[in-house]
Amino acid sequence: EMSASLVGSEMCIRDRVEALDIEYRLNTMVMDITKERVVTTMSSERGICQIQADAIVLAMGCRERPRGALNIPGYRPAGIYTAGTAQRLVNMEGYLPGREVVILGSGDIGLIMARRMTLEGAHVNVVAELMPYSGGLKRNIVQCLDDYGIPLKLSHTVVKIHGKKRVEGVTLAQVDAQARPIPGTEEFYACDTLLLSVGLLPENELSRQAQVSLNPVTNGPLVDENLETDVEGIFACGNVLHVHDLVDFVSEEATRAGKAAAEYAQRAVQKTEHSVTETFVRIQSEGGVRYTVPSQIHRKQEKGLNIRFRVNKVFGACKVQVYLNGELALEKKKKSAAPGEMEQILIPENVFEKVAEIKEIRLQMEEL
């Protein structure tokens, strides 16, 4: 959108918000959202307020999974951090969490922190990953681990944390195909810090209050091609919708959701109630496709459609196939695909012109 490479602070474009005279409220928490689009907020400046919105865009982001979600045996000593917390301590506060580090999970933040801790003078002993593949981008594995000689142990997890007041070490063990530790494979690593990069959870508490249906795979809202949820007038974008790799995709989604919400709010006549089963068709995910965004589309498409998805296993040379009403409509070859990297396929407008009404749409992967 900016036609340039920008850092996060430059992407904020606060001057545009002020130039367009957009009202914004800082230090304000949204307490509740109803299906009728009534937003309840609370702040020290205004107290509790209620706003009747014409359209709402959900953009609450996601949070890191904490240690409590992992059920790792051991005491609760100092020195256990989520990777994002450690990132803030190092980058913004100027503190080094520890000197001898073990990282559990190979998500992008964990990989980046392995490099960052090394550059700050700490020693990263190992990165352990429960799955048989990394959860991060390939370039981050190369630039953050391989370039610094940091070992990555796949199909391994932490089975015990040692130490009472401060972390003294962790025990790793190899896991089987059901993610169960294999007896006899335990290894002890002395460390004073354990960083957890074990996934992100979309912040959808407000979505549930608004009775928005959630995708059990992504834990984010089910949306159509306009990023509108099944609650009329409520849209979603970014990490609250599904976890992203790149902020470029987040920004593009935000633009789409904002435009669709603005168009909805500007309509003189509100949309009539519609039945999801009659108006929409669900996108079926098969052959290695874990999920798609959007998860459903209108039966009649007049524009091109960009589908983003993740695979559920590592693929070598493969092809992505789109079927419309049981017939192959589009095929795209790829050198590789992995669960840690989001994929996308653009279905051109001319493909939909050949179909009067979409009764079935299916996305699948096939190895070459």
Give the location of each predicted region.
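FAD-site-proximal beta/loop scaffold in flavoenzymes
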Residues: 58, 80-90, 192-244
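A conserved FAD-binding loop/helix module that cradles the flavin
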Residues: 237-284
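Rossmann-like NAD(P)H-binding beta-loop-alpha module
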Residues: 85-134
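Short, aromatic- and glycine-rich surface loops/edge beta-strands on solvent-exposed regions
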Residues: 320-322, 348-368
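FAD-binding core/adjacent interface of flavoenzyme oxidoreductases
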Residues: 10, 14-100, 176-184, 195, ...
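Single conserved hydrophobic/aromatic residue that forms the stacking wall/gate
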Residues: 1-8, 12-13
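A Rossmann-like FAD-binding core segment of flavoenzymes
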Residues: 14-41, 51, 118-205, 303-336
